[in-house]
Amino acid sequence: MIKWPWKVQESAHQTALPWQEALSIPLLTCLTEQEQSKLVTLAERFLQQKRLVPLQGFELDSLRSCRIALLFCLPVLELGLEWLDGFHEVLIYPAPFVVDDEWEDDIGLVHNQRIVQSGQSWQQGPIVLNWLDIQDSFDASGFNLIIHEVAHKLDTRNGDRASGVPFIPLREVAGWEHDLHAAMNNIQEEIELVGENAASIDAYAASDPAECFAVLSEYFFSAPELFAPRFPSLWQRFCQFYQQDPLQRLHRTNDTDSFSATNVH
């Protein structure tokens, strides 16, 4: 059982929060005890600073709140919670939701249509999610709705539109853009060869640089074994930006599991 270092100082309300149960999802089991402790500390602050708003009858209990907060804080585990300063509310639907979408075509005509969305991240507003897809984000499959939307927030942290280039030193931007576009082209080539459904990386990553950064951020944390060997140069840039190495965590966990298995009699 993990001994949490903050328990001496936490309030009665915080003590009641089911952090250990919340940490039991597959995505977070690769973290060391020290990393889990740090993540929970950030998640506690997240719940103090942000407002989780359930919509359309969705029931938000303490376990769900904790797991949502943990997933929000995983990408900023080493960056710091201030990287999530760009919003104050998280709106949560029970399932994918319908929105009115307005877009302009190449000749300037404005079109309106109703579309189904899994999530949204407004540059100067809230993050919008749905619980069905949040639940599907608990495993290590390459899909993670919360990390996807957080990546968009990190992308626009410098105040500009999402470009696929997060807030990094100016000298690194050209290299980042080169590697990101190379990854997009590679993903598009696979799509043309085998089709969207059979592609090993979500085809949405090939749609534009901002979505490529968000989708690959999902794979960075939840399927590093697919990301790292395929795009090694971009992988290193992601490791440097997020200041984390999920592939190393995965290898460490696998080594521990193998060692435990060889010692079972």
Swiss-Prot record:
Zn(2+) binds at H111, H148, H152, E211. One of its GO terms (biological process) is proteolysis. Binds 1 zinc ion per subunit. It is found in: Cytoplasm. One of its GO terms (cellular component) is cytosol. It is an enzyme of class 3 (hydrolase). One of its GO terms (molecular function) is zinc ion binding. It comes from the Bacteria. Gene3D superfamilies: Collagenase (Catalytic Domain), Glucose-regulated metallo-peptidase M90, N-terminal domain. Its cofactor is Zn(2+). Its EC number is 3.4.11.-. Keywords: Aminopeptidase, Cytoplasm, Hydrolase, Metal-binding, Metalloprotease, Protease, Zinc. SUPFAM superfamilies: Metalloproteases ('zincins'), catalytic domain. InterPro entries: MetalloPept_cat_dom_sf (IPR024079), MtfA_enterob (IPR057256), MtfA_fam (IPR010384), MtfA_N (IPR042252). Involved in the modulation of the activity of the glucose-phosphotransferase system (glucose-PTS). Interacts with the transcriptional repressor Mlc, preventing its interaction with DNA and leading to the modulation of expression of genes regulated by Mlc, including ptsG, which encodes the PTS system glucose-specific EIICB component. HAMAP family: MtfA (MF_01593). Interacts with Mlc. Belongs to the MtfA family. This is Mlc titration factor A. It comes from Escherichia coli (strain SE11). The lineage of its organism: Bacteria, Pseudomonadati, Pseudomonadota, Gammaproteobacteria, Enterobacterales.
